[in-house]
């Protein structure tokens, strides 16, 4: 906070004073994806130029160019003008470059600057910056030294600055002090309000690259009706039929055939949401873009030319993707994609082999994935551990509307279940029955899905909790819509576990149909919808209504890093019509529409981990248990580890919030905070705005819960459902994404094939080779961490706030996370906890806070991939 003593003694009486400063910035071409190749050759380039061929590479040239090209003006926090806004100092230009500064990061340049300042100007609290060059730069920080009676004042900027003529208002940055609106120094109030107004924009026109405007729109850019009916997709958001969270507005022109759909193309995101990275290996998001632009067409050409069959003939064929690789015609592929992409795809220069890293799930055992124990374990310790539910009644019932879908109650009978001596009633009473239930999600779509190449079931899986703490699958129900129509209900068959003969193959296939449901639900709902999509409205609302000076802005923004950018790329390349998800996952063109149906039942408050576990019937409240919850599956790695992380986040949020809100009455008058929450609910999640479960944000407790849910969702929940994708799904036999035929019927050639070879029957049923290559290419990228990742408990700048109490609380949070990581490592070494390793011997590390690379561990602050 500013210390504001009397005027006398602040600065030299009656005279000027030079305030020394250091400006740290990064040149555009250091951060530009297309310039990475030049950087690796040592061609740093200058700051003046058009496009990427910038001029000059020496420090002398750089200093000369900057000489009169970047001007700063200090703004007083204590001395207002007649209009009430703080006085503004003279234009001051950057001086010489600092060749050596210990705190500089890679690619950063530091410059001296000296401001003229006197007593009548008071204490600096903000500054203007004007860039007169034709090329933008990334402004990291300004540090003022030896400010009289203040010492050091820091400005953490982290923002792209374009030519000043492109802005309607001069760019402004505030010191790293923290104020709720009512405590803002009077001289800064006008600047604070003006900056928020600039970030909100006027909701008109097409957004340009340099814009910093945050606004809302519906998902009306996933399809392209101009390319034909097959490329049209329903608009998600803005209707009760297809509700959806809002995404960032781009203002692009509508398509010709549908004025309500937006033309696909390069997607605008507010400029500071796309800040760039330092190493080519960090351009993970752009790897996805390359997949869509180059790799997909290349794979399609290979299979169209019949260079390689679209089927695997044995399980070893699948393992060869990771062991020897498969040969592909580089002479064909190189005509479709650039050479650097070819080299990255083939891993080794000159080697015409596509080879994927060995996924963790087969590194110890090649066949343990096939066991019933592993099949069940991955429901509590795999990549989608947040769906399994406690079974409350038997037989399971459906929530589908019987006036539309008829009778959908399960056909599983009690006498069919092997419950280790328990009756169904006894197992229910002792809370030992659980279910993985995808019946209601898939049944409304199965008829449409099965009219395509794909053939699938809506599945229910019943599991029994054994005395040793592991789960045993005891029945799988495979359901289809009735041939006579939906009103006739479901046609179901119940498959029971078997160890020998054709029945064991049928059981293996039944598990595959379940995993196909699970893979699709995971990618579209657990991952995309419940983390990526639901967070974007909060990012938009935060930037529109919480000033950079606001304590909650400082708390939340690290958890938004890169999310709007990766979501925009997903709309371009992953979830778009005929994109990667539609090509490789079962629901195809219905994929994202299915997530809209699930969003109808999304509840913000249920995203809190304790509330989620209780709602799913896998935990009950127990004041005597850790975190006030008793897990009904005691060895539930995701829940056990997640509750530790959740509690640490909540404690940190409570301690931080208490620094700025002493009483509930402090929350209600905070105009920025109230407007932020009102808009996040009413616009960002507008299709659900009338739901009674939204917190009213009238108390400190509500504020803490809201912020904890946002941070949990963006960090730990996303880590839990994302970074295990390749470790578990990189072996397609373990997590197939599609099924192409139903269970063979007796008397058919397919049935005879199933009798003779369980491997061929399995391979002809699940994901094809083409789909496998696409899927593995994507999830390998999605499962990686960038080398400049910022993990939970870390900040990219140690001076993110000047508040020493906040810094101490944050240090405490970081220390707690280190303790938790050590505790979780000990649990993984506990031989009595079978679900932490399982038959595949893959320890549960997805909620270990730190990591890098393709490691199946690490919690980034944000949804950055």
Swiss-Prot record:
Domain Lipoxygenase: 178-865
GO MF term list: linoleate 9S-lipoxygenase activity; metal ion binding; oxidoreductase activity, acting on single donors with incorporation of molecular oxygen, incorporation of two atoms of oxygen
List of residues binding Fe cation: 527, 532, 718, 722, 865
Bias type Basic and acidic residues, positions: 255-265
The enzyme's E.C. designation: 1.13.11.58
Cofactors required: Fe cation
Residue ranges of every copy of the PLAT domain listed in the record: 50-175
One Pfam family hit: Lipoxygenase
Keyword Cell membrane: no
Catalytic reaction annotation: (9Z,12Z)-octadecadienoate + O2 = (9S)-hydroperoxy-(10E,12Z)-octadecadienoate
Pathway in which this enzyme or protein is active: Lipid metabolism; oxylipin biosynthesis
GO biological process terms, semicolon-separated: fatty acid biosynthetic process; lipid oxidation; oxylipin biosynthetic process
Subcellular locations according to the entry: Cytoplasm
PANTHER family associated with the record: LIPOXYGENASE (PTHR11771)
Name of the protein described by the UniProt record: Seed linoleate 9S-lipoxygenase-2
Taxonomic lineage of the native organism: Eukaryota, Viridiplantae, Streptophyta, Embryophyta, Tracheophyta
